[in-house]
């Protein structure tokens, strides 16, 4: 056994003690087989909690669904199950979606959905009517400085509200972050050059290459955190200066570094991000784990998963195997909801 492996083995009881102190994992919905029912999902992705319900992108069912956290009953919010681009101007449940990846709500209760394969961001208003906010339905890059509904996107994956209230879009296929002013409907590029190049530490977001900007989230103070999928890294974006700071990942794909500085750890295609209790939680998809970066110490640890693909067993978080998790969301109590995508489950890690 080499020195690094021996050290990791020696530290495992320490990690386990931290995670197991009252923590357990259980399944909220899903039984391990793909399907569409109150007990089944089919490749869940982005998710969030709102008004007593868990909203999630049921990717291969081409729907947005809501799971009532008390009754455990699932209802449709958007999508009719058909993989297409239809329904603008009508009820969201009558329209078609095409690989919905992530969703977010504004303060008024309107929902926004990033549809990867329609190359659009859709809006579902409080009355359940659907419209297209950004994108034309045709992949490309165009439209900056004009109406977002006439601009082209290429495989948008993630959306979030920035510190100034604009809706930020991770336009992954264009290696850019776009921003839509909701008051005017205009779109612009705020980060990325379109080049698939390494992202330098300490550079300004605007005009800097972004290697696969997959997910962006914002903290209460306006600080943003960005997952670079192809870059295998997490960056912090300063709210005032717009400067990118390298937070985690060496840039090389892998699964290593637990118990040490996050900057020295290897990540494996990070996708979902969420914030809670001075920590950044990430779905490290290709290592089949959920990892935590402590914002005070800079140390990274695994909080769920073993690093080996599988399905359970529960309830021990460090013995429960995952299968390519994509979505992760922390509620106000610190409970962590995980879209265990290819296990066809949504799990919750209780604080």
Q: What role is predicted for each listed range?
A:
Residues 326-351:
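Blade-level signature of beta-propeller repeat domains, shared across WD40, Kelch, NHL, RCC1
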Residues 54-55, 110-112, 166-168, 223-225, ...:
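Conserved beta-propeller blade signature
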Residues 68-72, 125-128, 181-185, 238-242, ...:
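Short loop/turn segments that connect beta-strands within beta-propeller blades
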Residues 1-14:
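N-terminal secretory signal peptides and thylakoid transit peptides that target proteins
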Residues 22-43, 72-99, 129-155, 185-212, ...:
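Gly/Pro-rich loop segments of beta-rich domains
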Residues 49-51, 105-108, 161-164, 218-221, ...:
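Residue-level detector of Asp-centered blade-edge/turn motifs that repeat once per structural unit
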Residues 59, 116, 172, 229, ...:
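Short loop/turn segments immediately following the C-termini of beta-strands
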């Amino acid at each position: 056994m080499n020195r690094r492996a021996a050290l990791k083995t020696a530290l495992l009881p320490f990690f386990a003690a931290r995670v197991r102190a009252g923590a357990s994992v259980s399944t909220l919905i899903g039984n391990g087989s793909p399907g569409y029912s109150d007990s089944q999902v089919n490749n869940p992705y982005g998710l969030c909690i709102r008004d007593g319900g868990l909203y999630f992108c049921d990717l291969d069912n081409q729907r947005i669904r809501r799971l009532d956290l008390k009754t455990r009953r699932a209802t449709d919010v958007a999508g009719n199950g058909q993989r297409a681009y239809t329904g603008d101007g009508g009820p969201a449940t009558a329209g078609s979606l095409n690989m919905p990846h992530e969703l977010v709500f504004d303060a008024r209760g309107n929902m926004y959905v990033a549809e990867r394969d329609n190359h659009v961001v859709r809006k579902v208003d409080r009355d359940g009517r659907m419209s297209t906010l950004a994108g034309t339905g045709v992949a490309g890059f165009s439209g900056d400085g004009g109406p977002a509904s006439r601009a082209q996107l290429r495989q948008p994956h993630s959306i979030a509200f920035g510190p100034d209230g604009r809706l930020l879009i991770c336009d992954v296929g264009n290696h850019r972050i776009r921003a839509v002013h909701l008051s005017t409907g205009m779109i612009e590029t705020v980060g990325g050059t379109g080049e698939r190049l390494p992202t330098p530490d300490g550079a300004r977001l605007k005009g800097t290459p972004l290697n696969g900007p997959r997910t962006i989230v914002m903290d209460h103070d306006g600080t943003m955190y960005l997952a670079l999928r192809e870059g295998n890294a997490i960056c912090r974006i300063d709210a005032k200066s717009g400067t990118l700071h390298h937070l985690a990942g060496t840039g090389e794909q892998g699964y290593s570094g637990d118990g040490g500085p996050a900057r020295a750890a290897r990540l494996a295609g990070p996708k979902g991000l969420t914030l809670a209790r001075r920590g950044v939680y990430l779905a490290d998809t290709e290592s089949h784990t959920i990892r935590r970066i402590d914002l005070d110490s800079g140390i990274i640890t695994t909080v769920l998963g073993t690093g080996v693909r599988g399905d359970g067993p529960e309830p021990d978080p460090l013995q429960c195997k995952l299968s390519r998790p994509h979505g992760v969301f922390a509620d106000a109590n610190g409970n962590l909801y995980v879209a265990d995508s290819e296990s066809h489950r949504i799990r919750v890690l209780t604080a």
